[in-house]
Amino acid sequence: MALWLGLRAVLVVAGLAVLLQLIRGWLSSKSYVFNREEIARLAKEHSGLDYEVAFSKIIVELRKKHPGHILQDEDLQWVFVNAGGWMGSMCLLHASLTEYVLLFGTAVDTGGHSGRYWAEISDTILSGTFRQWKEGTTKSEIFYPGDTIVHEVGEATSVQWSSGTWMVEYGRGFIPSTLAFALADTIFSTQDFLTLFYTVKVYSKALLLEASTHLSQLGFF
């Protein structure tokens, strides 16, 4: 029995290792809709404007450049995010299994743990300030409107945003791996299950939009 249990454990570990390698290969070889430089450049062009005006202009530009990949106005929704001890709000514009684009910010001073992801995440500031303290260092750095902060795969930092900080965020990697951190505080701390529902609903809508666009490009519609 012990031998059989040990063999099963080895097979499970080996299976997971193979699965991880397959995902890594897929992520490195697939094509992407967006890129970090494009999103950062677009956000920087509108930094310094009133953030609501900037958001509207950015959404219009993204829809022009990437038709079929940005949620329609009726599906856009600002949703609270509680994670790592901080609280903010996001408006998801695009999401798939490997990418997302969203608007993010906070109306109050907040800070906490960044999370550690199997994804690269970049934020370009439109207004306010973003303080980051990187793991292994003894000093923090403050970023201002127009600056882009890149959170590398596997990196962990302390983050702090002043009230009125708003930004455009782009993530690339295995996006489902980020959901555990993004939803943990909601499930185990705030128990705000309505926010959990909103989050799952908008992500599902984005996935359905991507699936529909992809099938249309293949000629199914």
Swiss-Prot record:
Positions in the Lumenal compartment: 1-4
Organism encoding this protein: Xenopus laevis
A Pfam family that the UniProt record links to this protein: ERG2_Sigma1R
Other facts noted in the record for this chain: Sigma receptors are classified into two subtypes (Sigma-1 and Sigma-2) based on their different pharmacological profile.
Gene Ontology CC terms, in alphabetical order: cytoplasmic vesicle; endoplasmic reticulum; endoplasmic reticulum membrane; membrane; nuclear inner membrane; nuclear outer membrane
The protein's name: Sigma non-opioid intracellular receptor 1
Entry function: May function in lipid transport from the endoplasmic reticulum and be involved in a wide array of cellular functions probably through regulation of the biogenesis of lipid microdomains at the plasma membrane. May regulate calcium efflux at the endoplasmic reticulum.
Residue numbers spanned by region C-terminal hydrophobic region: 174-221
Family: Belongs to the ERG2 family.
Cytoplasmic side: 28-221
Site label Important for ligand binding, positions: D123, E169
Keywords: Cytoplasmic vesicle, Endoplasmic reticulum, Lipid transport, Membrane, Nucleus, Receptor, Transmembrane, Transmembrane helix, Transport
Domain notes: The C-terminal helices form a flat, hydrophobic surface that is probably tightly associated with the cytosolic surface of the endoplasmic reticulum membrane.
Location of the protein in the cell: Nucleus inner membrane; Nucleus outer membrane; Nucleus envelope; Cytoplasmic vesicle
One biological process term in Gene Ontology: lipid transport
Protein's membrane topology: Single-pass membrane protein
Organism domain of life: Eukaryota
Self-association state and partner proteins as the record states: Homotrimer.
Stretches for region Important for ligand-binding: 96-103
Residue ranges of the TM segments: 5-27
